């Protein structure tokens, strides 16, 4: 069982989407169920509407799930598991205040040591715990042995017990910490493989230790994806616009192109342009590079142009939403436009009222002639017919003709454009 477990705390990051895509692909390859779990236990950071937005984005990318969970609805199970660990003396109540812990951290810092919880409350007698009225957290006792696990991308990883510490699993408000909720949910939902960003590597031994302490012995496999760098080679920040999937979509980049690019990023693929369904046939998670991958917006836009060309004409007409059969004309314009947004602007420029500027007189002459001109099969015949009837020459012919046909003084060669614009010429002459 594979899962994608986002938090509804902001726009979906492309790194999260990449993890969702890879989990979905692997689930399909293994013929396993795919879980979507909304990790909403950090109530202070949750943003209204983001849960639905996550589902909408996944649907746009063709990612479906067989099971849907809300993490906060599992709170009773988290508390039951915490009580089990306390009753078995594997976890303990810790009454240390934030101020006390901070003072110990500062002391360790001055001594040049890494701070580790010193076990102050670990050996408290049961009666002392019962009689103490201070707020408390619950800590899981640190492991006693080296923890090892295999990562499909990073290989063999090991963590020494002193580097894991006796960490908090339940807060003073009786809500679980991220690692505890995540580990318990994965256990209850029978997750068998976790694919996520490498920023979670340090969480893995803690989650393994939680499940082991609860007596869960089913093997879990992992793949931690390398971080995505921005175009300057620095870890991509959530503050950067194109790190947001929502921003990319609103910019007119197709879901299929984004998926194509993210699958290809830091990965060897048999071809450059492909669909998600095609990738399912050959994708290999172990072939993903260990090294961070640099995000290249220009490359993504290039891929987007190719995906626009792949769209069926009737579907592209719906996307453009201009009530005309403009698919072939729009695909021709991918030599200039890289996104659906840019294509819509090109189409509007063609079919909206135009500013003739200094060529107003010439444009009026040409428009009158174009209303009834014969639509020749080739551009040369069309051009020669119009030249002879208009008595215009050079710049005073070609510039106004370009404005009438495209809405711009610059653009593609009119001879190249003609086969795609021909059927609309009579209409354009009447705008």
Curated annotation (Swiss-Prot):
InterPro entries: aa-tRNA-synth_I_cd-bd, aa-tRNA-synth_I_codon-bd_sub2, aa-tRNA-synth_I_CS, aa_tRNA-synth_I_cd-bd_sf, Glu-tRNA-ligase_bac/mito, Glu/Gln-tRNA-synth, Glu/Gln-tRNA-synth_Ib_cat-dom, GluQ/Sye. It is an enzyme of class 6 (ligase). Its main location: cytoplasm. One of its GO terms (biological process) is glutamyl-tRNA aminoacylation. SUPFAM superfamilies: An anticodon-binding domain of class I aminoacyl-tRNA synthetases, Nucleotidylyl transferase. A motif ('KMSKS' region) lies at residues 235-239. Keywords: Aminoacyl-tRNA synthetase, ATP-binding, Cytoplasm, Ligase, Nucleotide-binding, Protein biosynthesis. GO terms for cellular component: cytosol. Pfam families: Anticodon_2, tRNA-synt_1c. GO terms for molecular function: ATP binding; glutamate-tRNA ligase activity; tRNA binding. It is found in: Cytoplasm. A motif ('HIGH' region) lies at residues 6-16. Belongs to the class-I aminoacyl-tRNA synthetase family. Glutamate--tRNA ligase type 1 subfamily. Catalyzes the attachment of glutamate to tRNA(Glu) in a two-step reaction: glutamate is first activated by ATP to form Glu-AMP and then transferred to the acceptor end of tRNA(Glu). This is Glutamate--tRNA ligase 1.
């Amino acid at each position: 069982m594979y899962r994608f477990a986002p938090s509804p705390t902001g726009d979906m990051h492309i790194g999260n989407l990449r993890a969702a895509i890879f989990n979905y692909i692997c689930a399909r390859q293994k013929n396993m169920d795919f879980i979507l779990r909304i990790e909403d236990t950090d109530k202070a950071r949750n943003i209204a509407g983001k849960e639905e937005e996550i589902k909408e984005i996944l649907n746009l990318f063709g990612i479906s799930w067989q099971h849907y969970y809300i993490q906060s609805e599992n709170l009773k199970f988290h508390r039951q598991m915490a009580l089990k660990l306390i009753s078995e003396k594997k976890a303990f109540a810790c009454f240390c205040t934030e101020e006390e812990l901070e003072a110990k951290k500062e002391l360790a810092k001055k001594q040049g040591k890494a701070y580790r919880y010193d076990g102050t409350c670990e050996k408290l007698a049961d009666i002392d715990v019962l009689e103490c009225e201070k707020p408390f957290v619950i800590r899981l006792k640190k492991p006693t042995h080296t923890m090892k696990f295999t990562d499909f991308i990073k290989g063999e990883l090991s963590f020494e017990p002193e580097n894991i510490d006796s960490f908090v699993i339940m807060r003073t408000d009786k809500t679980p910490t991220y690692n505890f909720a995540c580990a318990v949910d994965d256990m209850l939902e029978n997750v068998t493989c976790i694919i996520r960003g490498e920023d979670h590597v340090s969480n893995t031994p803690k989650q393994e230790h939680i499940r082991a302490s609860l007596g869960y012995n089913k093997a879990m496999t992992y793949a931690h994806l390398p971080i995505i760098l921005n175009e300057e080679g620095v870890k991509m920040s959530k503050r950067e616009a194109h790190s947001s999937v929502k921003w990319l979509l609103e910019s007119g980049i197709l879901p299929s192109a984004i998926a194509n690019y993210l699958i290809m990023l830091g990965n060897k693929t048999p071809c450059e342009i492909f669909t998600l369904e095609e990738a399912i046939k050959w994708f290999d998670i172990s072939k993903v590079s260990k090294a961070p991958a640099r995000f290249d917006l220009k490359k993504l836009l290039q891929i987007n142009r190719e995906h626009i060309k792949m769209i069926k004409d009737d579907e592209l007409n719906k996307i453009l939403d201009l009530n005309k059969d403009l698919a072939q004309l729009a695909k021709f314009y991918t030599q200039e436009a890289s996104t659906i947004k840019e294509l819509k602007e090109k189409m509007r420029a063609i079919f909206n009222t135009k500013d003739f500027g200094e060529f107003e007189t010439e444009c009026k002459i040409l428009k009158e002639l174009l209303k009834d001109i014969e639509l020749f099969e080739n551009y040369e015949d069309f051009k020669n017919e119009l030249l002879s009837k208009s008595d215009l020459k050079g710049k005073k012919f070609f510039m106004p003709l370009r404005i009438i046909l495209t809405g711009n003084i610059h653009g593609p060669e009119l001879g190249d454009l003609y086969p795609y614009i021909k059927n609309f010429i009579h209409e354009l002459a009447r705008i």
